[in-house]
């Protein structure tokens, strides 16, 4: 069993040749390699050893304050001293002004090494981006330097007991007071709602002004600090921390706001519009969490399979390592393919955002990456447990920890089912979205053809045709909901196949060209055929709303 090792060479290859990072303004390939090499060393040495400690010790609530393991404090001091939080922040606010894609690559490595530590610090980067786009100059000048320097950390406060996926049910209120506002209400499931790294947290809160319209249109966005400028507390208390399946060292808090002083970000009723910047970034961050933990699972499983001697092959004279068995190879290659393909999809989407801004393709790919990569990590962890056999079921080998830590990724930042409904409903009805994604796959087919990969060209062309036919059916269906799951999976597989066509086209530039070509063949022959099943499901007249009501009721 090994600790995570930052996959630096594969990340740099993906950034340069698949995401085409050099198209981003101010991208410097040499500097990116230097920064990420230094980051990888820090993460391997300081962050990766925290993972089993955090899982074992967890967080504690003592006298109303969250306390993290002592080892986390030592690592946070190095994180802060290294200036990692401010990688992409504007230099005028104390940041380093590097591309956001570079910060995302750092974030992937951080999540792979210790997802609980990552959860505690990473939201600040999204809040920095949100304030940079939406806040007044005086708010930016006060808060971005504090966040970039790790003087303060941050949280995002949306969820309430009655308002999970349906934010229109939010009840937390905001009342005008002088030149600001006061917040009253409660929020649950707040990652990083409190911590003792700095003892200071700035919360972005969705709340409803008292004269606001009902529903989503009545929500506004507020910045509420845990402490006021004189150092006194600001009416925010930690009611409890949740005991979770995983992420034991990530503080998931229930917060109470009682006359909490706050400033509005944007105008009244613009809460979701202003929060959109943070929510989209966080959805791609969750996709990268999936990539990172899938990579961790693949690393541990490959190490085990290469050393565990068990069974014989027909042509062997004695016991062999289990990586020589074909079914084990299937599982290992699935892990590796999901990791590399998910990384390629997500980095390319992040690069599109930074280079070109928003687009119909980005809107679609944000949901596709979030869903595909979070499903991929659970599959990768399950396969890792299976390869380990009985040992995989033991805590000592830490594959079960990856499964526990990653399972939440299919739930937060929009459940995967809701993302599927969004794609099969609203986004699919936008002709620009269909055209943009179609063109994205066509370009990948052309790249495969130009690179002399006829089998990949044919396989991806078949997936594209299946996707086109399914899109027409789903877009015109009066009841797309039962088709949404299969349509999202089909769309994800098409994007995954396109990513692998590009990876194969650039195989000679990869750290291990033989590995890329072998995995590309595996994806084509063993993974893409799944698309045909989901295409057929989309053709069926499926209905679930006419099922007997009684079977969904408790006797």
Model regions and ranges:
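A short core secondary-structure module
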Residues: 180, 184-233
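A glycine-rich, basic-preceded beta-loop-alpha segment at the flavin cofactor/substrate interface
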Residues: 189-191, 227-239, 244, 251-282, ...
């Amino acid at each position: 069993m090994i600790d995570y090792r930052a996959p630096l060479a594969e990340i740099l290859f993906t950034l340069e040749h698949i995401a085409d990072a050099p198209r981003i303004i101010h991208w410097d390939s040499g500097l990116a390699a230097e920064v990420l090499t230094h980051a990888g060393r820090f993460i391997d040495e300081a962050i990766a050893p925290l993972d089993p400690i955090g899982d074992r010790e967890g967080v504690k609530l003592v006298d109303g304050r969250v306390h993290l393991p002592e080892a986390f404090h030592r690592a946070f001091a190095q994180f802060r001293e290294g200036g990692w939080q401010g990688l992409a922040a504007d230099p005028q606010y104390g940041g380093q002004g590097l591309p956001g894609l570079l910060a995302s690559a750092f974030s992937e490595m951080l999540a792979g090494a210790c997802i609980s530590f990552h959860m505690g610090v990473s939201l600040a980067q999204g809040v920095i981006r949100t304030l940079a786009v939406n806040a007044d100059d005086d708010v930016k000048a006060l808060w971005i330097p504090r966040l970039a320097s790790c003087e303060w950390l941050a949280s995002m406060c949306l969820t309430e007991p009655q308002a999970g996926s349906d934010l229109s049910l939010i009840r937390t209120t905001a009342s005008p007071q002088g030149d600001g506002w006061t917040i009253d209400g409660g929020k649950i499931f707040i990652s990083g709602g409190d911590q003792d790294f700095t003892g200071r947290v700035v919360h972005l809160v969705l709340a409803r002004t008292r004269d606001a319209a009902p529903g989503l249109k009545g929500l506004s966005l507020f910045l509420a600090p845990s402490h006021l400028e004189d150092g006194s507390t600001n009416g925010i208390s930690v009611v409890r921390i949740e005991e979770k399946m995983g992420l034991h060292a990530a503080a998931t808090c229930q917060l109470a706001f009682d006359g909490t002083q706050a400033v509005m970000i944007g105008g009244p009723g613009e809460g979701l519009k202003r929060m959109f910047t943070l929510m989209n970034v966080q959805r791609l961050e969750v996709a990268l969490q999936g990539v990172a933990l899938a990579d961790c699972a693949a690393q541990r499983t490959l190490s085990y399979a290469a050393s565990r001697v068990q069974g014989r092959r027909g042509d062997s004279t004695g016991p062999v390592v289990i990586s020589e068995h074909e079914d084990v190879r299937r599982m290992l290659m699935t892990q590796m393919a999901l990791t590399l393909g998910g990384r390629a999809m997500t980095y390319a989407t992040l690069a599109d955002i930074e280079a070109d801004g928003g687009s119909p393709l980005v809107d679609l790919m944000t949901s596709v990456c979030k869903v595909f990569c979070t499903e991929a990590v659970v599959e990768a962890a399950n396969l890792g447990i299976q390869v380990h056999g009985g040992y995989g079921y033991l805590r000592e080998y830490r594959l079960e920890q990856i499964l526990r830590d990653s399972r939440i990724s299919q739930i937060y930042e929009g459940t995967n089912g809701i993302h599927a409904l969004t794609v099969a409903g609203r986004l699919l009805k936008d002709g620009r979205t269909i055209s943009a994604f179609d063109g994205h796959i066509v370009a990948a087919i052309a790249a495969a053809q130009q690179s002399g990969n006829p089998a990949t060209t044919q396989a991806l062309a078949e997936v594209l045709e299946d996707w086109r036919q399914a899109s027409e059916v789903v877009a015109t269906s009066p009841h797309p909901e039962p088709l949404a799951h299969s349509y999202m999976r089909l769309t994800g597989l098409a994007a995954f196949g396109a990513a692998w066509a590009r990876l194969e086209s650039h195989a000679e530039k990869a750290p291990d060209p033989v590995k890329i070509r072998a995995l590309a063949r595996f994806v084509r022959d063993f993974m893409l055929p799944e698309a045909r099943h989901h295409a057929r499901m989309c053709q069926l007249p499926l209905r679930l709303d006419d099922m007997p009501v009684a079977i969904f009721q408790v006797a």
